[in-house]
From Swiss-Prot:
Keywords: Ribonucleoprotein, Ribosomal protein. It comes from Pseudomonas entomophila (strain L48). One of its GO terms (molecular function) is structural constituent of ribosome. One of its GO terms (cellular component) is cytosolic large ribosomal subunit. Part of the 50S ribosomal subunit. This is Large ribosomal subunit protein uL30. Belongs to the universal ribosomal protein uL30 family. GO terms for biological process: translation.
Amino acid sequence: MATVKVTLIKSVSGRIPNHKLCVKGLGLRRIGHTVEVQDTPENRGMINKAYYMLKVEG
């Protein structure tokens, strides 16, 4: 299955609680942290919800 690189580029401090949980669910911990996640509908949904804090490649 294809993977997607996701990087946290903005802080989760002061954000909507559900968006914070999406970032946590993707495995991101701090600004500049990059993870590779599988390109599934569940992960795409989390990325789309918190898109303004993330950089997505692939």
